From Swiss-Prot:
Species per Swiss-Prot/TrEMBL record: Enterococcus faecalis (strain ATCC 700802 / V583)
Binding, Mn(2+) 2: 15, 75, 97, 149
Cofactor annotation: Mn(2+)
Descriptive protein name: Probable manganese-dependent inorganic pyrophosphatase
Pfam (any one): DHHA2
KW Glycosyltransferase (keyword) present: no
Signal peptide (residue range): none
Length: 308
């Protein structure tokens, strides 16, 4: 049997990388030959966690079929968010907390999706169900993923299960949850030295919506003005992305992690859908979205509804 590659989505966030590391470890403990890999380099936030817990970043891969015919997916299922040759390999398992879309397999598989705030919360439960001890380093990456995905429990996606798992994992990792959590989130807000193109690609996903393609990117900051001062540069980069990739709409969500509010910037032919989705009026391609922090729960469903 060939080695099984375990990976999260393109433009990986802390959960995509942390869940790959923890799920690969769990599967190895259960007797499978696995390797955690990534579909991109770690963000500064993720690298902070990797460095803190002294874990080497997973190997970056762009395709799988040349080295294996077996993969396991974490933190995603939609093919357009996955590895380039996903249709050429056998998907053995999926562990995810997102909607199911653009996904099919030729063979039966293990599929576990739960409406929680973070994939690592589900994997924590799987460790317990299988009576596998979680090493401190692995626990550190898992709690980092939960902190990241739930914005330290401020996101509407956060559930009591996420909170309970985070506290248990923090104890194993021997960290102060609040103090470490704030440091982790702030590590991901250093945006000033990044080009517009890099900013737009830090955490971006494409979504097919009734024959249209919508790209939704999100960046976290502690200073909205710092990002919005670069609006013209960002708009030019968004327009270029639309032209290069045939996106019908590019949406950038700029989230203030301290206030739990976001500013939306939208460019594209389907821009009018924004006003209907969020009951706002775009002014200079922008709208303020109070209380919006979650792409998964507060942006994508609303856009999907108006496109349908």
């Amino acid at each position: 049997m060939s080695k099984i590659l375990v990976f999260g989505h393109q433009n990986p966030d802390t959960d995509a990388i942390g869940a790959a590391i923890s799920f690969a470890y769990l599967q190895k403990e259960l007797g499978k030959e696995t390797e955690a890999v990534a579909l991109g380099t770690p963000s500064e936030e993720t690298q902070y966690a990797l460095d803190y817990f002294n874990i080497e970043a997973p190997r970056v891969v762009t395709e799988a079929a040349s080295e294996t015919n077996q993969v396991m997916l974490v933190d995603h299922n939609e093919f357009q968010q996955s590895i380039s040759d996903i249709a050429e390999v056998n998907i053995l398992a999926v562990v995810d907390h997102h909607r199911i879309a653009n996904f099919e397999t030729a063979d039966p598989l293990y599929y576990r999706a739960e409406p929680v705030g973070c994939t690592s919360t589900i994997i924590y439960k799987m460790f317990k169900e299988n009576n596998v001890t979680i090493p401190a380093q692995i626990a550190g990456m898992m709690v980092s993923a939960i902190i990241s995905d739930t914005l330290l429990f401020k996101s509407p996606t956060c559930t009591q299960e996420d909170i309970d798992a985070a506290h248990a994992l923090a104890d194993i990792a021997e960290i102060n949850l609040e103090g470490y959590g704030l440091d982790l989130l702030k590590a991901g807000t250093n945006l000033s030295d990044k080009s517009a193109e890099v900013l737009l690609d830090l955490d971006a996903k494409s979504f097919p919506m009734n024959g249209k393609t919508v790209r939704v990117a999100q960046v976290n900051t502690v200073d909205l003005a710092e990002v919005l001062d670069r609006q013209a540069e960002l708009e030019a980069a968004m327009a270029a992305e639309n032209a290069a990739n045939n996106y019908d709409l590019f949406v950038l969500i700029i989230t203030n992690i301290l206030d739990s509010d976001s500013e939306l910037l939208a460019i594209g032919a389907e821009q009018a859908k924004i006003e209907a989705a969020f009951n706002v009026t775009l002014v200079n391609n922008r709208a303020f979205l109070p209380g919006v922090v979650s792409r998964k729960k507060q942006v994508v469903p609303q856009l999907t509804e108006v496109f349908n």
